[in-house]
Amino acid sequence: MYFPLHCHTHFSLLDGLSKPNQIAKRVKKLGLSGCAITDHGNISGSVSFVRAMNRHGLKPILGCELYICKQHASERKKENASLNHLVVLAKNLDGWKQLIKVTSESNKAEFFYRKPRLSLDQLSEFCDGNLIAFSGHLGSDLAEVVFGEKSKEAFSAKTYEEAESLVDPNWLKNTTELAQKYNSIFGEGNFFLEIQLIDQNISPSQTVVAKALRYISKKTGIPCVATPDAHYASRDDAEDQRVLLCANLETTIPSIKKKMANGESVPLETFFRSNSYHIPSPEEMLEIHTKEELENSIKIADMCEEYNILRQPILPPFPCEKGPEETLRQLCRDGWAQKIKDKIPKSKHNEYADRVKHELEVLQTAGLSSYFLIVRDIVNYVRDNGWLPGPGRGSAAGCLVSYLIGITSIDPIKYGLIFERFYNSGRNTSERVSMPDIDVDVPVSKRDEIIDYIKSKYGQEKVGQMITFQTMMGRGAIKDVLRAYGGISFDEMNLITKHIPDKAAIADELQEMFEETGESSVIRWALENNSEKLMDWCYIDEEGGVQGRLAKRFEQAIRLEGTKRAQSKHAAGVVISPQPLNEICPMILDTKTKQPVGGLEMQDMEDIGMIKFDILGIAMLDKIMGVENILEKGTVI
């Protein structure tokens, strides 16, 4: 047996293919005890990976394949642009915290250059014995040192003899010194020489490097470890991953094949030549690795403690003399006096009283008093500055407490709105309390100022925005697949995708599909419901199979739906934490604003205890304020 320690998910954007749950299913099928996640330059997939592994009773190990530059990362010279790879794993909870610090540091604006990066000396500041590292694949500096100045030539060598002839004369001295430097940085027993042989037939330099590292291991005592370089779960997924690579490289599979046939160099060529970047079976690994190298993978897994990064939501304290529970009750009493007592018929007072009593009992049992006080404070800041907040969006308008304390302006009883649609305590478990979701609509022009106020109140380092990912969905997935293979005109692509709806337009139908089958697909829904319009290209037969001229492409697009494609800053989400954000989650660089944002998605933020508040900039509120201003001035329109 062995333990896969080098695996990428679709959080390695347009490079890794598989979703965390697909990785977990593959590991379970192979009878392995767990798996490590080592995405390129980020740990954004860690929380969803832990959830997936937990569901399948498997051990998750959290790691990252870091980008290492040769000089200090603040240097942006040409000679410091090339990056080497280094894999690090968290041994324990302290190691996870160090991993957060490392990835946050590499994402600082002064260090980020095309990729998040650090020099080895910068990285060493975070190595306190709680991180395990191994040298990396052919993209590592150790592999580079084996060949010296001829490394690029060696990595494209076609035969073992050619690659071996390009080994640097001083390889032994230079490689030994570098390996010992790594060993010193990470601490005795925490550094391993990584042996990858998955593509030795296609990439003979891989075999040369493995031979060199095995020799260094005997010379220094630094152990070797066998790893895959998994970019997808199963061998059958290779063709799907190539679609991602084509989107990344802005090319097509026919173009790549033509260049390879002509002997031209192609970026990421081995991915197009090989189907071996999957999670191998133990039998596959035993064919190419020594027993000791496989046993060391299990040894490393055993060195990594089991720890839990998931936790209950932690609300930041809201300053109030009488405590949040009594303060919220008093605000409800004040709201009653202003909005109910003399404005609602007495015959209905009991209905209102029963409703507010029930809501307070539910909300305060769940420990949510501070949440409502924080939201109210934000809304009050908007009003106190003479700006216009929204009256209440979505299910939050069904909460009488929100109306009484001034978060919303809508009486839920008057309009027959249901509290349980806003907050259902039945979703709470002993492990987790469900958080409410109140969207605060604010003028677009004032949103940044409002966020600055929140930062000033709770602490600059405790407030931040978060990342969101764009995924391949429906139309986009079809277009990515068709572009990758070529042969379809732009006009025909648009004609096809015209009959595939947006995900949001069929959200309820997709939910029903998921409840019935465990999966949901916009494309599949379109084939089942717009069959006549798509018949020229693809259709579903009586047995549920996909048929037609473009059946294979549609099937591929269905498989790719939901795959991460790009990242950006979330349009509305703001998190407020009782402790500095960079102690709880990785901070990544928003390349547009050059500002750090939380490097986890909304659901993942909540799963590690962060509280998310939606502050939505609404342009219509700016326009209404503009009209009010004109009317106040008495300007003739």
Model-predicted regions and their roles:
Residues M1-I637:
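Alpha-helical scaffold/interaction cores of sigma-54-like transcription cofactors
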